[in-house]
Amino acid sequence: MASLTLRCDSTHLLPSRDVVKGTKPFGTSLVYPRIISKKFNVRMRVIPEEGDVFSSSKSNGSSMGIELQPDLVSFGTLAAEMIPTTMDSPEVEDEEFDLDRPTDGFASIPQAIEDIRHGKMVVVVDDEDRENEGDLIMAASLATPEAMAFVVKHGTGIVCVSMKGEDLERLELPLMVTRKDNEEKLRTAFTVSVDAKKGTSTGVSARDRAQTILTLASKDSKPEDFNRPGHIFPLRYREGGVLKRAGHTEASVDLTVLAGLEPVSVLCEIVDDDGSMARLPRLRQFAQENNLKLISIADLIRYRRKRERLVEFTAVAPIPTMWGPFKAHCFKSLLDGVEHIAMVKGEIGDGKDILVRVHAECITDDIFGNSSGGKQLAIAMRLIEENGRGVFVYLRGPESKGIDLSHKPRTYNTNSDQAEGVSFPVASREYGIGAQILRDLGVREMKVMTNNPAHYVGLKGYGLSISGKVPLITTP
């Protein structure tokens, strides 16, 4: 693939850049097929076949103009960093030279997209380094009674329909609980359940469920077309899809959009014959027996990040801190315009064994430091300074889980100040913005500073891996 390199003197920050927008496959300008850059003191690379989802750390600059090989620019995967003229920055090779190549034992994403387009189901595994749970997924607009009978026979019976927020709002389907009150393990965004009023009886049969799903998928449906509660469970899709949250909800809609269909999909977890959740070996056997494509969310992440981005680099500057000097790398979210900061210490080099902390913004903790969140921020920065090499990613705004200011003081009455949950760490499935930032900084293998025992899913899709975890010990 190609690379775009701009080298200018490093005496000024990036003043301006003109972007010619391209296609918008997911409703937001995530793909930039052409980039026209004015003079600025930044080195930029269009990274071959690279792109993005998680969080943490990551030539001298005489003016040379532009070196361009054009075939890669269409994917819009642009990384950029300000570089002092006195520093050398080694090129980081992409270990995953072909982001379209599926993981061994899995079908390719284009094969799955083609099946979705023709109304077939695919089996999607959430993360092969996690629990390997699999979902049956198909386009909601192509649902049939026969397909629903198959889903109910081989699934949990909880049939869900993943939808975008604007469609849920159009149908007046609110979340079952508010986001801050969502205690479900994976923070899946369930809305109230529904049945279609027309063409159904009890709502539970395969035919009735198919009718409800088709009604949900129809652009002509209205709020009054549904009974509440019912037997189909709509789920709210996170904008940005698997590049934002590495879950089945997002994967299912991404697949239907890539197939050129309405952004509404059916999904149901697969169970084994004994009623337990089917794991990867059994899922592979199940897919073969039923002639279904088996894909992983990690592969879908790789497929999308080759073509799209969620963040763009804006500037970098040296910043003195109470712990020592760092470089602040600023990135802007293309989803909501929120700017995030990566505080980098030392040289990323080969990207291995990097000490990393991903921290969600919390004003009361971070500024006033009265709870574990502020203490953990300070400890993480100190550890990075002592280590001489590391990255602290500070995710702002919506990335901090949308916690309102009134909610935080109420947590002080719960006696849970010692738990990391009070500091609102980023959910393990919602590292999309941070993962792209880390990848752009050159991070490949990291030691994550966290007190959270949860596994982080979807990292493989970004070429990221965790070599260890470092606890952040705070004192009362």
Curated annotation (Swiss-Prot):
Tissue: Expressed in leaves, shoots, roots, flowers and siliques.
Residue ranges of the region described as DHBP synthase: 44-306
This protein's UniProt keywords: Chloroplast, GTP-binding, Lyase, Magnesium, Metal-binding, Nucleotide-binding, Plastid, Riboflavin biosynthesis, Transit peptide
Residues holding GTP: 357-361, 376, 399-401, 450
One Pfam entry name: DHBP_synthase
Pathway: Cofactor biosynthesis; riboflavin biosynthesis; 2-hydroxy-3-oxobutyl phosphate from D-ribulose 5-phosphate: step 1/1
Residues that bind Mg(2+) 1: 131
Co-factor binding comment: Binds 2 divalent metal cations per subunit. Magnesium or manganese.
Catalytic activity: D-ribulose 5-phosphate = (2S)-2-hydroxy-3-oxobutyl phosphate + formate + H(+)
Residues annotated as binding Mg(2+) 2: 131, 248
Inactive GTP cyclohydrolase II as annotated region, ranges: 307-476
Localization: Plastid, Chloroplast
Enzyme class: lyase
GO cellular component: chloroplast
Site (Essential for DHBP synthase activity): 231, 269
Residues the record lists as binding D-ribulose 5-phosphate: 130-131, 135, 245-249, 269
NCBIfam families the UniProt entry points to: ribB (TIGR00506)
UniProt record similarity statement: In the N-terminal section; belongs to the DHBP synthase family. In the C-terminal section; belongs to the GTP cyclohydrolase II family.
Functional note: Involved in riboflavin biosynthesis. Catalyzes the conversion of D-ribulose 5-phosphate to formate and 3,4-dihydroxy-2-butanone 4-phosphate. RIBA2 and RIBA3 together are not able to complement the loss of function of RIBA1.
Entry protein name: Monofunctional riboflavin biosynthesis protein RIBA 2, chloroplastic
Source organism of the structure: Arabidopsis thaliana (Mouse-ear cress)
